[in-house]
């Protein structure tokens, strides 16, 4: 299988003065100076502590060295960006893991669920996958900005960056650019703290952070893959035309930050989504995945929302790390074969490279299919309130199958997908196919 983005991309929703942006004669492209970003100069690094701790993995303890530090990444939107960071490194780091790093930020809220980031995205992958992992606190958007403007939400801060973009045509003032710089500087800070270079790196980001890591992959050959949650590219030229009618600067933004599926067609990438994410329309996600030809996988968590909070999503990410960093073969979950019976539907899973599959489930929900109106739309979307149910598939004659009773059901509202639990060594996680809409065969 080869596959919304911008939780608050009001720019593309066309909420503010498209006429003004249409008059701009000069557009400034995104500037990425890797030499400067990789230099420790200006980090103002503050080393806080180094300690050893253990994580239990399959009834055994894995020792990690935990570095705590603080660094300065940039001045952005009239504010100094300082970041608290945690680097977890296996004490017994295998030779095959040297030079590798999993870098995570802008995935879940540091303030609301700090444990999910440090434990689920930090300690656990370091211990289970066996690679160094860096997590750090994202942009401090609610300090000086709130004092200056009286606005307290990150959405309002992001909207302010888009206002600057409209007035200047400069891609470097958009929130995504600031997030990208912060991640690159975090990487350099981790190298300074650890004393060694990381030249094979996987990035993870959610929502606007998901867009940022996908864009970073286009500028830095050391980035071998990304995990994107709460965010997918725009699936169709039709959507881009519609958004450009609302906001004439859309093509410039799309070009600079590589937002089209075609920009990712041959990349190594994983999408880690929630079935009910307001920003990841299930049908759009399917259309994106159908356009990808590289090494790509998706996991859709049933009843999951915008942030990738579920333990199963963390486990899916660890599977991907094991696959990309160490080359372990990874099953490829395809859309199931569906056969209509009398008052029932039969489902047969289709899984390429099935080694390691431990269990398979059918996920289904009934809701009205409504076309996605575009990023940052405030329209009510039926999929956001869908109630997904899971049904185990039984393995018979080498095939995983299940039957869904449908008497009295409105099959025009049926959506479904297959997910599989996979084990690779000491890493267990989930993968899925994209959400499908049932279409009755003629």
For the regions a protein language model found, what residue spans apply to each?
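Primarily recognizes the serine-hydrolase "nucleophile elbow" in alpha/beta-hydrolase
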Residues: 185-249
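N-terminal cap/lid segment of alpha/beta-hydrolase-fold proteins
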Residues: 42-96
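Histidine-bearing beta->alpha loop at or near hydrolase active sites
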Residues: 297-309, 314-318
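Short beta-strand elements
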Residues: 425-442
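Cap/lid segment of the alpha/beta-hydrolase catalytic domain
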Residues: 110-114, 126-127, 131-181, 233-242
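Surface beta-strand/loop "capping" patches
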Residues: 312, 321-364, 389-397
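Short, surface-exposed "cap/lid" segments of acyl-processing enzymes
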Residues: 79, 84, 90-130, 134-148
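The feature captures the conserved acid-bearing segment of alpha/beta-hydrolase catalytic domains
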Residues: 237-291
């Amino acid at each position: 299988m080869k596959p919304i983005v911008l939780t608050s991309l009001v720019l593309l929703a066309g909420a503010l003065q498209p006429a003004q942006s249409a008059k701009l004669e000069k557009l400034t492209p995104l500037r990425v100076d890797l030499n400067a970003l990789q230099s420790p100069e200006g980090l103002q690094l503050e080393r806080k502590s180094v300690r050893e701790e253990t994580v239990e993995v399959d009834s055994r303890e894995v020792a990690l060295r935990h570095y705590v530090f603080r660094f300065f990444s940039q001045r952005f939107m009239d504010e100094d960006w300082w970041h608290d960071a945690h680097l977890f490194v296996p004490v017994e780091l295998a030779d095959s893991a040297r030079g590798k790093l999993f870098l995570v930020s802008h995935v879940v809220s540091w303030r609301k669920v700090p444990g999910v980031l440090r434990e689920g995205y930090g300690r656990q992958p370091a211990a289970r996958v066996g690679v160094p992992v860096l997590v750090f606190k994202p942009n401090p958007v609610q300090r000086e900005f709130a004092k200056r403007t009286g606005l307290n939400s990150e959405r309002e801060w992001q909207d302010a960056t888009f206002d600057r973009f409209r007035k200047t045509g400069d891609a470097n003032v958009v929130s995504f650019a600031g997030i990208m710089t912060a991640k690159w500087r975090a990487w350099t800070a981790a190298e300074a703290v650890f004393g060694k270079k990381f030249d094979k790196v996987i990035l993870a980001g959610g929502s606007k952070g998901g867009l940022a890591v996908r864009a970073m992959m286009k500028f830095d050959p050391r980035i071998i893959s990304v995990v994107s949650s709460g965010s997918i590219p725009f699936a169709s030229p039709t959507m881009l035309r519609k958004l450009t009618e609302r906001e004439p600067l859309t093509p410039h933004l799309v070009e600079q930050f590589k937002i089209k599926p075609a920009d990712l067609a041959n990349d190594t990438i994983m999408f880690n989504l929630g079935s009910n994410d307001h920003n990841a329309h299930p049908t759009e996600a399917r259309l994106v995945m159908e356009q990808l030809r590289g090494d790509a996988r998706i996991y859709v968590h049933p009843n999951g929302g915008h942030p990738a909070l579920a333990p199963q999503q963390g486990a899916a990410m660890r599977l991907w790390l094991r696959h990309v960093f160490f080359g372990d073969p990874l099953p490829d979950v395809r859309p199931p074969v569906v056969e209509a019976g009398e008052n029932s539907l039969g489902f047969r899973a289709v899984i390429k490279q099935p080694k390691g599959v431990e269990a398979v489930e059918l996920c289904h929900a009934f809701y009205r299919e409504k076309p996605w109106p575009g990023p940052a739309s405030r329209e009510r979307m039926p999929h956001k309130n869908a109630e997904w149910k899971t049904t185990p598939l039984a393995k018979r004659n080498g095939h995983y199958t299940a039957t869904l009773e449908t008497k009295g059901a409105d099959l025009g509202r049926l959506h479904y997908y297959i997910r599989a639990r996979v084990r690779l060594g000491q890493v267990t996680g989930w993968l899925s196919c994209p959400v499908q809409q049932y279409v009755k065969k003629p």
